[in-house]
C-alpha cells in the first residue's frame, strides 16, 4: 500500500496480537462470530429494560424541585381568606427541604447565587405567613454570612437574572420588616447598582409593549408592567415560558385562572414543591436521544428513539423549539439539538429557523438582543451547523461564529466555565469537537471519547436556580455503554485474529501487503461498523479493501469484450502481470478472491441477512475488474465496491434492480469521486467540503420511491472512513487504533 499508510510500528502489531482473544476460525478461511455469553445477555437485558421503561415514561419530563420557585408559589394568598396561603403544602415543602447550614438550594453543588437567591426567597415566604421562626432565622443568618462569597473569585455560574431577582426579593423583605438581612452590605449595593444599569438598558417600550423572552423569565423582578400585553404571551398550559415562579407572580398580579391551573398541576406533581422549569418534555427527549446515540447504544432503543423524535417533531415550528412544548418562544440551544437530531434521522427541518437567532454578526439566545455567552449552547449550535447541506448559508454563518467563539474560549483560562451548565468535562468535549469534524468522527471514536468523559450523572443545569434532569442523569446509560463497548471490542479483537490468520494462509505479504495494512483496514471497518452482530460486514469490508488494492496496484486485467455480461473468472480474463510477477501468482490472487466471495456469502446467510445470490458479489467484482481493465483508473471504483459489498453482505441489496436506480447511481458516482480525491490528494478544501455536504444531503433527505436508508447510510459510512484517513496524521491514527481496538474500558 501507499507508504503514507504504513503507519503502525512493529510494537503495535505485536501488542495487538498478544491482546487479541482466542480466535474462532473455520477450516476454510471463514470466521465464526463469538456467541453472546449468558452473563452478558442477562446483564444487558436488565439494564436495557430499565432504560426502556424510563424512555417510555418520560411524559412531561422529570426535573428536580426548586426552592426558589416553590417559595414564590408559597407567597400566593388564598382567594377567599387572604390571611391564609393558597398552597400551604408548599410552605411545608420549604421547611422539609432546608439544608443543614440553614440555606436552601442544590444540596450537592454550592453556587453562591443559587443558595443566596433560594434562601432569601424562602425566608420571605416563611416571614410573609409568620411561621417557622427558627428556620427563618437560620436562613437569615446564612444570607448574612455568605453574601460576601459573591465576591470570591470569578464565579461564572451566575444564575439567570440574579442581579434583577435578588434586589427585588430584598425589597420585599424590607417591606415585610425582616431584620438581620444585609441590606446595606457593600456586596448588596454592588448588585443593586448592576440591577439599575441593566434596567436602564431596558427601554420602556420593551417593558410596556413587547417583552422579550429574556425578560419574560424574570418578570417577578420587574415593575410597572403592562399586564394586558404580557398575558398575550401566555403559553397554552397557562405558564410563562414554563417558569412556576414567573407564573406565580403573574397570578398574584392578575388572578388569571390559567395561571392557577398550571400552578395547581405543578404543585400536585411535585408534592408541594415546584421545579425551575416545567414541563421539560422536549429537552428531556433531546438529551436522551443525543446521549444514547453518542454512547453508541442507540440501536437497542430504536422504537423508543423514534417515538421521542416523532414527539419533538410535532412541536417543531418555523421558529424552532423550547425545552417545553407549545411555547410562544424558542431558544437556540434546544433548537440546535433538535435540528441536528431530526435531520440526522431524516426529518424535514429547515435551517432557516436559525435566522430567527441571527442578530447582525452574532447569534442570540431567544431571538432578542441577548447574545449567546454560553460555551455549551454554542457547542450545540456548532454541532448543528456540521450537518448542513450544500448551499445552506445560514449554517455556514452559524459554524463560523460558533467555531470562533469556542476557539477563543478554549484559549482563555477559566473561560470555558458555563452560565447554563455545570460540567467538569465541557472543556475536553469542546476540544474534541473542534479537533474532530463530524465528517472525520467515526462512531467508535466518538463513543469511546464520550464514554470515558461521560458525567451526566453529575451535570447540573443553571436557570434561575440549579436543577437536574433525572431521566437523563442516570448511570444506567453509561453502564450499558461500557458493557456493550467491551463486548464489541472482544468481537473486533477476534476478527483481528482471524484477519491475521487469513493474511498468513494467503501469504499476502508476497503481494506487498503488510500486517499493518490489514490492521488499518480492520480498524476503519470496526470503527465505522462496530456492532458485534455485523461481523460479516466488517470482514467483507477488510477483504474487499485489501484485495481490490492488490489487483489495482499490481495487475492490469483486460476483460474480454466478447461477452456482454462481465464474468469474474480466470478463464475469461486476459491477465498481464507486472515484470517479475508470474501467471501463477495472478491465478492465486484470483483464487483468493473467489474463496473470499464464497465465504462472504456464507457469512451473510449465517447472519440471517436473507438469501444472497452469487451474482450480486461476483458481478460487483466483475464490473469493477472490467472497468479497471479498460483503464478507468482516473475515477477509481473502490469506494462503491466496498459499499456494495457491505450492503450485499448486510442483506440490504437482494436484487440487481436496485443497482440501476437513479439514486443509487448518483450516490455511487459521488462517493467514488469523494473517496478517490481523498485517497490521492489528502487535501481537504472547500470543494471537498461541498461534495461531502452534497453526499450528506443525498443520504439524509427522504425521497419518494427512493432506495432504503440502510443502503444510503453505507455510502456515507465509507466516505467518512476515507475522510478520517485523510484528515488525521499517521501518529493520531496509530493512537486511535491502540485505544479503540485494544484498550478495555473500565
UniProtKB/Swiss-Prot annotation:
Regarding tissue, the record states: Mostly expressed in stems, and, at low levels, in roots and leaves, but barely in flowers.
State the Gene Ontology BP annotations. gibberellin biosynthetic process; terpene metabolic process
- GO molecular function, one example? magnesium ion binding
Q: At which positions is motif DXDD motif?
A: 331-334
State the InterPro entries in the record. Isoprenoid_synthase_dom_sf (IPR008949), Terpene_synth_N (IPR001906), Terpene_synth_N_sf (IPR036965), Terpene_synthase-like (IPR050148), Terpenoid_cyclase/PrenylTrfase (IPR008930)
Entry note about domains: The Asp-Xaa-Asp-Asp (DXDD) motif is important for the catalytic activity, presumably through binding to Mg(2+).
Which species does the entry assign this protein to? Isodon rubescens
Source taxon at top rank = Eukaryota
The protein here is known as Probably inactive copalyl diphosphate synthase 3
Q: What is the lineage of its organism?
A: Eukaryota, Viridiplantae, Streptophyta, Embryophyta, Tracheophyta
Q: Which GO terms describe its cellular component?
A: chloroplast
Provide the family line.
Answer: Belongs to the terpene synthase family. Tpsc subfamily.
